[in-house]
Amino acid sequence: MKKRIVILGSGESGTGAALLARHLGYDVFVSDKGAVQEKYRKELDEAGIPWEEKTHTMDLILNADEIIKSPGIPEKSDVMKAVRARGINVIGEIELGYRHAGKCTIVAITGTNGKTTTTELTFHLLRTAGLNVRKGGNVGNSFAAMVLDDLLHPSQATADRIFVLEVSSFQLDDIQQFRPRIALLLNITPDHLDRYDYSLGNYARAKFRICMNQKRGDKFIYNGFDPIIAEFFEAPASGLKPAPIRKGFFKNGSIRVGVNRFDMKTGNLRGPHNMFNAVCAIRVAHLLKADPVKIQEGLNTFMPPEHRLEKVTVAGGVTWINDSKGTNVDSTFYALQAMDEPTVWIVGGQDKGNDYSPLMPLVKKKVRAIVCMGLDNSKIREAFGSLDKPLVETGSAAAAVKAAAGFARPGDTVLLSPACASFDLFLNYEDRGRQFKSAVMKLNS
């Protein structure tokens, strides 16, 4: 009798897991409480995988031998309470991928902020150096989908291949044996605490799961000057020697790793936080024996991911930057810190109980004017309204761009870094960023 695998969730992660499980010969069923996107409907139907949407049929779920849970499904959901009560083993998609990945090198990257940029940069450096590398996880393709692709094309599944994976705390919650050869922990700041009983310690421990299966000879690289990492750090019991990155790695516009210095003045990364992201990526490339000349070439040619301090255009002497991914105060702190010119700051959206006080010194020093973009801007007015700076409210990207243009002078920067979620006016942060960019280009056309 075939092993029955039930997948909860039908997005990139769930569908990738379902397709891999079907290829492995399992009896597979996909259940999603929401709607199944057309793209994934087609993939599931073509593979002959039964699925349901907008409901969870418990009789079809609780007869599973094993359940693969998509990372967005909380443990407190009704379906997970029922699954746990039944005692069914639960794993995540990256655990399934790891079981069947064969010989390879896995680089796993986590942190509250900077995961995507560091993942993309690490991948870019390794690819520029000519290594056999793929990227995925929480960005791009699911790990399971990439493993399936290797199983379907055995000639590419060589032992020298490298997977660079962005992994979230939600994904790490559901690993059992997943073991990266190189693990990176960039930072920890309070986020997603509703999933962790509002406990920062629980959230931090979820992040530290990235190294829980590592052994002697593996590498665990972490931020050695992050106070929350320091507070909750526990030395691994496996003989693994953690490798902290200390302050002082970035001096006079260059980064030193080993005996090599890498010039950061010629690339497209801005801000101290991105210098830290860069040193992490360089460390990985160095460990994997990438040619230093090629590492420098990769640093020179890398373009930051969309919506992350993304330069939109320079018009009339004003630089427009899209940092729509700045959905929390910590991200926006780094964005403002990276500004070298007087800044018109577009901020606001769906507030997540933000404390804006850490931004105050930067706003006082760097911001010329504040443009609120949201349905309810009361907390932003409360935080910054007493400053001797213009502050206006707008209700759309087009209106915010028009208002910002009125304040900006040649040599200034207009920065969209909202410090808030996007769901009051936009579908998501990508929609917010693209509407902003469209409005900027229309204004300057």
Located regions from the model:
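Nucleotide phosphate-binding/pyrophosphate-handling subdomain across enzymes
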Residues: 3-4, 16-24, 132, 265-367
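Residue-level detector of alpha-helix initiation sites
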Residues: 12, 74, 113-117, 275, ...
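Short beta-strand "acidic-cap" motif of Rossmann-like dinucleotide-binding folds
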Residues: 28-32, 134-135, 164, 416
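C-terminal helical cap/extension that packs against the catalytic core
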Residues: 40-42, 357-412
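Residues in the short beta-alpha loop(s) of Rossmann-like NAD(P)-binding domains
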Residues: 11, 34, 139, 225-226, ...
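Phosphate-binding loop of NTP-binding sites
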Residues: 3-4, 22-23, 58-62, 71-224, ...
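Short internal beta-strands
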Residues: 27-33, 220-224, 346-347, 366-375
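N-terminal leader/targeting and accessory segments in enzymes
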Residues: 1-92, 96, 238-241, 290, ...
